[in-house]
Structure formats: structure tokens, C-alpha cells
């Protein structure tokens, strides 16, 4: 039996479970069985309304120092995005299939391989270091790809209420680009969305003097918002960006000036800006143009940043040893559950396989990356809590 098989076997077991958000489909039961056998105490946390029940897992194995020792947590999600048109896949998206050295399936890269890797890494670590000093934790949810209202954030709230102290967290998101380990995420930008409605007066398009066209009135303000410089970024983050995603106005008829226009927009912002500061600037610009408007805000997540420290150095060293790659710290990409964990954990780093195929038809992971991924995770455990 080759050394790669335990991680690969667990990955394939998880993949076969059709755990589209918010369904877990027994994935966490598999993890609980494995982790319990390795000495973990496991707790299931069910959350969400009846029509959107979310399954969460908190598992911990205390080291000899008990709660006084360092606690390293792996965070991940068992849920996957929908497959899209199944007929466009070259194989069943929920039947792990090997072609050309790759494992094809929904969740192969995002992120069932990472989960399997850290479980097997923990099993190997515990077997080799039965008297380990620090503690190991798992925070797993089935609501990361969806609204994320009843997943990781709920467990973080529970841990905060209990006074649980997390020292390090590795999030298994697929962060690599061209090869395993070439990039890890030591932070993420925040996301702030707005729904702006500018009011005018509806009328016949042939009589504009009897109407007020909200599209025309909004256009100069939107141009100013699009051209604005929000901040300069910093050493870790690029400058904040503002983008419109949708504009809708009118009834569909071509002879009516609309009574209002609605614009959806989004900020991706760095630690150089704050939500309140960005909101204030938007309102200032809109007010300066004399618009009659309403604006509803949704904060998708605050930015977070882990500066170079013990966790990033442990990961970089492990990646160099196992992959022969010098990793790059990056804050690019979308939001992740790291934004919730960063509120209760001072060092949060994301690391997983290449992400080029995630959420796509024929999602896959290189089979040759699976064992090194597990080994990197094990080395991090050995460095920080052995």
C-alpha cells in the first residue's frame, strides 16, 4: 500500500458525499469517527432555520499543557458549490475520477482534499507525538459557500462565549496558483456592498421638461465614485476598489423616463480604510450632487491581516521542505471564513492546493500534490505544538 493512500482514500470518501451547501451529507460523521479514534472530543453544532440547516463541527484534542498550551486549529468546509450542467463534466462530479494524474470531482480542490490532509496529518502527528504539548482543533462547517450566516461565525461566537483561546489557525482554502505552496493567504480584503436607489419623476420621454430622469442625475455621481481614490493600500493590501455590478431603471418600455434607478456596487477594501469611512465618503459624494436617494449597506466582512510571525514562518518552512518552493504571502482574492476566525485568533493563514479549477466544470487536484499537502500540515503541527 503506497503512503499516499490514506489521504487519497479519505478525500475520495468525502467527495462521494453530495454535500452542496448547506448539506453535509455525512461528511462530518466520517471526520468525527476518525478524530474520535485519534483522541479528539467532538461536538456537533446545528444552526440555521428549518429550510437551511447547517452542520458544524468543533473537535479538540488537548495536549499535556491542557488549556494553558498553544491551540492550533484547522478550519474548513464540507459544503461544495453546485456542479453546474452535469452533462458538461467529463465524469460524474461526485464520483472521484483519475485522469492524466489529476483527481476530478466537485470539492476536489475546494476543499475536501485539504480536510482529508489535515485529518491524516493529525493522526500521524498524534501517533508520533502522543505526549504533544499543545492542542489541535478542527472547526468545520457546511455553510461556507452559501450565506455563511450559520456556519463558522456561529462556532466562533460559541468559542468566544466559552473563553476558548485560539493561538493559530490554518484555513484549508485552495490558495496555491501554479504549483502547491507557491502562495498562502495571510489576510483578505473586506467586502462592503451598497444598493443605491436614486429617485426622479417618471414621464413621457418626449416631454423631459415634465419629468426628472434619475439615470441622468445619477450618472455624474457614479462617474465620480468610479474615479475616486479611496486609499493607497499598504504593504500587504492593494488600494481599495469600488465597482458597480448592476444598474436597473425603467419599465422596459422605450418611451418612458423612469421614476427611479437602482445601482448595486461593492467595495473590496483594505485595512487602510474602514466601513464607516467609506460609507461617509459615498454619502458625501451623493449629497454633493443633490440627489434624492436611499442607500442600503451590507457588510460582507471586515478585512483581516496576519503579519509575519510564528505561523507564517512555520508554513513557509514546511512548504520549502516538502514542495521545494518559496511561498508568497498574499491578500488577493475574495472573502473567506478567515474573517470570522481572525476575531478570536491572532494568527490566521490560509493554505491549500491550486485554485485554478475551483467552482468550475471538471474541478480537479493534482494527485501528486495530495501527499505533500498532508506533509506540510503535519510539519506545521510538529513545529508549533509538539
Curated annotation (Swiss-Prot):
Single biological process term from Gene Ontology: diaminopimelate biosynthetic process
Protein name: Succinyl-diaminopimelate desuccinylase
Required cofactor(s): Zn(2+); Co(2+)
Binding site for Zn(2+) 1: 77, 110, 173
Keywords in alphabetical order: Amino-acid biosynthesis, Cobalt, Diaminopimelate biosynthesis, Hydrolase, Lysine biosynthesis, Metal-binding, Zinc
Catalysed reactions, semicolon-separated: N-succinyl-(2S,6S)-2,6-diaminopimelate + H2O = (2S,6S)-2,6-diaminopimelate + succinate
Cofactor binding: number and manner: Binds 2 Zn(2+) or Co(2+) ions per subunit.
Assembly and oligomerization: Homodimer.
Amino acid at each position: 500500500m503506497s503512503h499516499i493512500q490514506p489521504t487519497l482514500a479519505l478525500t475520495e470518501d468525502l467527495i462521494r458525499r453530495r454535500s452542496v451547501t448547506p448539506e453535509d451529507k455525512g461528511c462530518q460523521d466520517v471526520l468525527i469517527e476518525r478524530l474520535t479514534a485519534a483522541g479528539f472530543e467532538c461536538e456537533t453544532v446545528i444552526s440555521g432555520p428549518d429550510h437551511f440547516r447547517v452542520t458544524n463541527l468543533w473537535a479538540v484534542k488537548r495536549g499535556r499543557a491542557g488549556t494553558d498550551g498553544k491551540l492550533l486549529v484547522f478550519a474548513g468546509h464540507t459544503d461544495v458549490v453546485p456542479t453546474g450542467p452535469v452533462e458538461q463534466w467529463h465524469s460524474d462530479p461526485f464520483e472521484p475520477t483519475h485522469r492524466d494524474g489529476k483527481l476530478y470531482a466537485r470539492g476536489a480542490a475546494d476543499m475536501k482534499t485539504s480536510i482529508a490532509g489535515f485529518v491524516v496529518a493529525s493522526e500521524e502527528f498524534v501517533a508520533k507525538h502522543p505526549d504533544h504539548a499543545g492542542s489541535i482543533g478542527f472547526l468545520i462547517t457546511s455553510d461556507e459557500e452559501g450565506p455563511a450566516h450559520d456556519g463558522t461565525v456561529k462556532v466562533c461566537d460559541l468559542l468566544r462565549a466559552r473563553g476558548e483561546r485560539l493561538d493559530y489557525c490554518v484555513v484549508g482554502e485552495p490558495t496555491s496558483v501554479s504549483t502547491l505552496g507557491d502562495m498562502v493567504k495571510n489576510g483578505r480584503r473586506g467586502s462592503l456592498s451598497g444598493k443605491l436607489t436614486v429617485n426622479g419623476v417618471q414621464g413621457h420621454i418626449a416631454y423631459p421638461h415634465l419629468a426628472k430622469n434619475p439615470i441622468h442625475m445619477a450618472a455624474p455621481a457614479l462617474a465620480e465614485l468610479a474615479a475616486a481614490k479611496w486609499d493607497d493600500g499598504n504593504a500587504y493590501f492593494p488600494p481599495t476598489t469600488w465597482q458597480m455590478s448592476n444598474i436597473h431603471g425603467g419599465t422596459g418600455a422605450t418611451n418612458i423616463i423612469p421614476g427611479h434607478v437602482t445601482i448595486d456596487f461593492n467595495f473590496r477594501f483594505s485595512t487602510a480604510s474602514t466601513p464607516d469611512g467609506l460609507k461617509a465618503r459615498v454619502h458625501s459624494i451623493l449629497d454633493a450632487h443633490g440627489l434624492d436617494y436611499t442607500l442600503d449597506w451590507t457588510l460582507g466582512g471586515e478585512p483581516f491581516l496576519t503579519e509575519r510571525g510564528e505561523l507564517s514562518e512555520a508554513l513557509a518552512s514546511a512548504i520549502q521542505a516538502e514542495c521545494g518552493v518559496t511561498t508568497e504571502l498574499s491578500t488577493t482574492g475574495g472573502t473567506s471564513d478567515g474573517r470570522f476566525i481572525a476575531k478570536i485568533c491572532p494568527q490566521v493563514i490560509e493554505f491549500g492546493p491550486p485554485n485554478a479549477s475551483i467552482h468550475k466544470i471538471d474541478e480537479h487536484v493534482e494527485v501528486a500534490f495530495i501527499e505533500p499537502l498532508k506533509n506540510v500540515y503535519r510539519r506545521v503541527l510538529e513545529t508549533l505544538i509538539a
